[in-house]
UniProtKB/Swiss-Prot annotation:
The gene is cyb5r2. It comes from the Eukaryota. Its EC number is 1.6.2.2. FAD binds at residues 127-142, 166-201. GO terms for cellular component: membrane; mitochondrion. It is an enzyme of class 1 (oxidoreductase). GO terms for biological process: sterol biosynthetic process. The chain crosses the membrane at residues 2-24. This is NADH-cytochrome b5 reductase 2. NADH-cytochrome b5 reductases are involved in desaturation and elongation of fatty acids, cholesterol biosynthesis and drug metabolism. One of its GO terms (molecular function) is FAD binding.
Amino acid sequence: MLVALAAIGVTVLLFLIKALGSGAKKAPVTLLDPNAKYPLPLIEKQEISHDTKKFRFGLPSAEHVLGLPVGQHIYLSAKVNGSLVVRAYTPVSSDEVKGHVDLVVKVYYKNVNPKFPDGGKMSQHLDSLKIGETIDFRGPNGLLVYKGKGKFAIRPDKKAEPKIKVAKHVGMLAGGTGITPMLQLIRQITQDPNDNTKCYLIFANQTEDDILLRYELETVAKSHPEQFKLWYTLDRPPQGWKYGSGFVTADMIKEHLPPPSEDVLVLMCGPPPMIQFACQDNLTKLGYPEAGRFAY
């Protein structure tokens, strides 16, 4: 009898230990206050292409996560030549990653583009950072949050309450570095086995070498062919290029994005002229309602 009771006691004890252990502590969050600045150190710099680099910044501890909801972005701020420079970025690392955050940034160097002889102030500042030097992060920021399973909370402006939009199909129009919020969302959707939302991306660039995060995008497209459709268009395509060429057109949208519907949301991120003339004007022409569009 005593042996039986002891066995039961041990079983109960093991169950309690397991139950307590399974309720793992939530990882501490770095971005606790969207109005505060958090100086984070550069811990790694990796060259991705001739003008693009990945910058890895350390979080306060190896257990910390950044704390950035899907759909949101951060602001980096720094004094450059005596002036405050602030720029928005979307990390390419998942928010579940502990200890660091990764940004992929296209560096706009001086005297390369005659229209912008000074180049990009923030991107060149990032490129000049030495390992261990810090830059200020602020966030989360943004008007859109993805809640999962096709549910988006979208605010018309910063002071407005969010409106819920449920989409079975998400069209995406991205140009250049505007790909980062799209990849963030694509990864979140395809990594959740309970999320059946389908994504359709048209990604516009000048040349094939300018395609950011191509490997990551094509990896997802290959592993989730029914859930993620990928199409590129280039201003200056190479010979034998099998995707699109030129600006995003109404015909291109018609062919590669889902048609207008109540359960369709179209997201846009890229240079302002592209958003206005290649995206918004063509979406209007094709009958996509304004309530079913969002520009980052």
